[in-house]
Amino acid sequence: HLDIEEFLELRKNTGDDRRRTHDMNTANWVPDLFMKRVVEGGEWTLFSPADVPDLHDKFGKAFEAAYISYEKKVADGELTLFKKVPALQLWRKMLSMLFETGHPWITFKDPCNVRSPQQHVGVVHSSNLCTEITLNTNEREIAVCNLGSVNLVEHLVDGKLDHAKLKRTISTAGLRRKNAQVHA
């Protein structure tokens, strides 16, 4: 994305507060091609999403082929809104911001999609906050990860687990989670 460098700084504590989002959780969705360019010491071309709308829904070889074709359009003068940056420099900035602010998280787009058990649903575009659960989304559906926990100590009676109480708690928690999804 053409604005990645500004995006990386959204959680910084310094600078113009109008350009900060202190409460927003942000992430970088990194394709394998970018990492290849980092390793090779190559350049990364930043595009406007309006000029490359299909990249969002591609991964792996399909993403790589489309991305390289857009770079050819830049070279041929067909695309004029772009910026080339050293991939390693951009990677270092991503890591610096992650270390400094805890954001944006880094998640790898291609492995998430290649290993997705839900490829029939479409391309994975995001994950939950901890990035261990991938979420399928599209123009009509937004995915949300609802988390919950059970305090097992509260289910002990004379040092033994009260299975009936635990079953009721889990059932109630499951219904509340389901209701939260339906009414959201």
Give the predicted meaning of each segment.
Residues 105, 146-149, 167-183:
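Long, well-ordered alpha-helical segments
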